[in-house]
Regions:
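Short, Φ-rich (hydrophobic/aromatic) sequence segments
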Residues: 1, 57-65, 259-263
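C-terminal cap/substrate-recognition subdomain and adjoining C-terminal extension
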Residues: 2, 151-171, 178-298
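A short, compositionally biased domain-edge/stem linker segment
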Residues: 2-11
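Generic structural signal of hydrophobic/aromatic residues within well-ordered alpha-helices
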Residues: 9, 63, 79-82, 101-112, ...
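Residue-level detector of transmembrane insertion/anchoring sites
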Residues: 13-15, 219
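Alpha-helical substrate-recognition element adjacent to the catalytic core
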Residues: 15-17, 27-181
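The start of beta-strands in P-loop NTPase/AAA+ ATPase cores
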Residues: 18-20, 224
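Short, acidic, Ser/Thr-enriched surface-loop or helix-capping motifs
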Residues: 23
Length: 298
């Protein structure tokens, strides 16, 4: 299945001179906080019996997934990083709760580029690894919980206007590490799926691969733009020599209004690269720390 999805990305042909990739969770839709706090983190606590250290699990997982330079990371590396940080916390060490090393997960992530449930299911069937099976069960329950909990969460203001305006001169692609099923459901629920040429999720590969397959070599480099709210979006753009427009966490509406009123026009006019883009990225970098707040205070 993943191979077919990748081939669909590769087969996309330009209909316009410009290309824009758009992240979804926390960028287009205000879903990131509710998904993490009400779906991902409670299921972690339940699956690994972390009730005794639940406050530290929530704080650590929120730092990794929402309030740090790792914001927007694929769920599997984010889980691994959360566990690594938990093991370093004195409160967790003193609790006597065992936080697994996730050795099998680390090995699988080194071997696999399409970090999604289909690839993990295949690995579990092939290996019978109990650690990977537990992580797969967690991931599947997260998806079920999201489907039950996340409904009616609107897009940020100025998103729809921006995409309508952008689509007049650019080919648009959703570039996300959310599972495809959830992406398609959310974009369709808000009647926005028709605004983009295609929706790419974690089953299509990394965000860097999405841009590479869909845009690199098909458009002039300064005609390719990635819009995102996380450092991974910036890295994907830089890896493909593309431009980047950041949606600032906590100031999403202001970011989209600025894009609608000036950023998009600059992109089409060829004046986005250079000082204007650098200012946007510098402001973005200041928002997301790499050191956890509990490390600073200890």
């Amino acid at each position: 299945m993943s191979h077919d999805l990748v081939e669909r990305l590769r087969a996309l042909q330009p209909k316009s001179k410009f290309f824009i990739g758009i992240d979804s969770d926390g960028c287009v839709f205000d879903t990131m906080e509710i998904k993490q706090k009400q779906c991902f983190h409670p299921v972690i606590i339940r699956h690994w019996n972390f009730e005794a250290i639940a406050p530290y699990v929530r704080e650590t997982a929120q730092f990794v997934n929402l309030y740090s330079r790792w914001r927007g990371t694929n769920r599997f590396p984010a889980l691994d990083m959360t566990f690594d940080l938990l093991r370093q916390r004195p409160e967790v060490q003193q609790s006597g709760v065992d936080v697994p090393e996730l050795t099998s997960l680390k090995r699988w992530m080194r071997e696999e580029s399409r970090l999604g449930n289909p690839a993990l299911e295949a690995k579990v069937k092939e290996s019978g690894d109990p650690e990977l099976e537990k992580i797969l069960e967690w991931s599947l329950e997260v998806n079920r919980t999201i489907e039950e909990v996340v409904h009616g969460v609107e897009s940020f203001d100025f998103v729809r206007e921006s995409l309508n305006k952008a689509g007049q001169r650019a080919d648009l692609l959703v570039v996300s590490q959310t599972p495809l099923e959830a992406l398609e459901r959310e974009w369709k629920e808000h009647a926005m799926d028709g605004l983009v040429a295609m929706i790419a999720g974690q089953e299509h590969g990394t965000k860097t691969e999405h841009l590479e397959y869909a845009a690199s070599g098909k458009y002039a480099k300064d005609h390719i733009l990635m819009i995102g709210d996380a450092p991974g979006d910036l890295k994907a753009a830089q890896a493909n020599d593309a431009l980047f427009y950041p949606v600032l966490p906590g100031e999403e509406t202001r970011s989209w209004e600025k894009f609608y009123r000036e950023g998009l026009d600059r992109f089409f006019e060829g004046t986005y690269a250079g000082a204007y883009q650098e200012e946007r990225i510098e402001e973005f970098d200041r928002r997301l720390p790499s050191v956890p707040p509990w490390s600073k205070s200890s």
